[in-house]
């Protein structure tokens, strides 16, 4: 065979996706699932920029499949070491209860990747139920290429109430008798 000999400029390859991990998350799919934590309590979420594997991209679109398991993909260790380092954010979608309050997700900015990984210990969700978490580049544009890097964790929870508020209810009675004749 023939070989190409020479050199080229340095090049960068976009990570295939983010593996998103929430330690201790039982991944409950409904109200009968195991409890993860209480509403509003901080938890840890970790993002790992990973490389492509055929089994996670069945439609060959360059993005992880919705059911893709990126946990075993190799790391993209240089992610986050760009001249202007890329950053990622988390968003959430309410999975259960249907019609529930989607609440607010805090601690969603991931910056300072090291060896392709970043972990935040102050992520919190202020409601009860189950959410899905989606990771994406903060600007949705890897190094000006127009391409995003994404990851999905379909079930995080079950989150339960942190406390209940009890108010006293002292009834007042109206006069019950009508006038006499």
Task: Give the residues covered by each predicted segment.
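Core sequence-specific DNA-binding domains of diverse transcription factors
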Residues: 1-181
